[in-house]
Amino acid sequence: MCDMLIESIKSISISESEMKRRFKFTNIEEIHKIEKANKSVMLMCAHYGSWEWIFIIQKHVNHNGYAIYKRIENKYFDRLVRKIRARYNTYLITNKETMSTLRQHKADGIKAIYGFLSDQSPKIESTYHWKEFMNIKVPVHTGAEKLSKELDMGVVFFKTKKVKRGYYETTFKTITLNSSEYDDYQITDMFISYLEELINEAPEYYLWTHKRWKHKDKVPKDFQ
């Protein structure tokens, strides 16, 4: 946890060449395949490892990158987060602007990579799906799946492995190029399953402090 905090802060000052040396992609061609298919990419992300470093992907792909984020009430920390995530020319979209922005991009013919932190806990009143996550049933975000189907995007999960202190390797796993062919919530369930596998391999690199299970006692009867 301490390493992740230090690495997040270091994101502000680390050089591009040093970041490329420390955060490598083993199969960036998975993203290139979707770009060549003339589709946008839905990158389903999680609070695992130094996830803030994923933004260096912009230096390896052709599509522009957009990160979905929730505005932080503390203005200082909000500016800090925006500064970190906007490095390497990544654009930021607040969660409230997401649907309208992505739909407008589709209408304008813009192809992009959209990063969604899909392991966060949604508001209970806007929950559509519950899923066992680390043996506890919780509400799960379905926005990435919904938009990928509506806007015909390729969907990708990425697995980050810590090689040693301050060094990572990321491997992409394409979930689908044709998201509309999947049943409701099937893509979301696949993401959760892949994430569980990743956590089980090295649980110490998951952000356990972000209240992922805060609604565990509110499971509706229909989902029990």
Positions of the model-derived regions?
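Catalytic core of membrane glycerolipid acyltransferases/transacylases, capturing the structured
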Residues: 37-97, 123-136
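A broad, low-specificity signal marking well-ordered, structured residues that form hydrophobic/aromatic
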Residues: 23, 41, 65, 114, ...
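Short N-terminal secondary-structure initiator segments
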Residues: 1-13, 58-75, 103-120, 194
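Short amphipathic alpha-helical segments and helix-helix/interface helices
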Residues: 31-32, 55, 78-82, 103, ...
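Membrane-anchoring hydrophobic helices of lipid-metabolizing enzymes
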Residues: 1-45, 78-83, 89
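Solvent-exposed, flexible loop/coil residues
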Residues: 13-18, 23, 27-29, 52, ...
